[in-house]
């Protein structure tokens, strides 16, 4: 079998392999928006231009996504941890393996990731379909890890 990673999935492949139906739905329309802090506004004001002009995924991750996740963690009293660039090997035989952009996990930041986990994929520049395929694959990987570790506190990712 040829080794695949999360990033290698194409949308049609992931839909077929995991027997999915794509449905467009408005999931969060009833949520009340919250105001961002002065810190986040100032940080994004400084970093946004640089991140967008650099054109790299890594710069967008470091200068746009990470500050937003840190703000979310602060608002939620550090009740979840943010892990960046961690390998999540859920099921190598099905291609559910490889590096995740971000993993959000229960509890405070620690050396051992606490389940349940949630995989977060950054938008891919000019390629929504590729990012969506990677996101679906990583969410399946996270689901496998969560089910495997249902009765345990920590996982080895």
Task: Cite the ranges covered by each PLM segment.
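Short, Lys/Arg-enriched N-terminal segments with co-localized hydrophobic residues
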Residues: 1-3
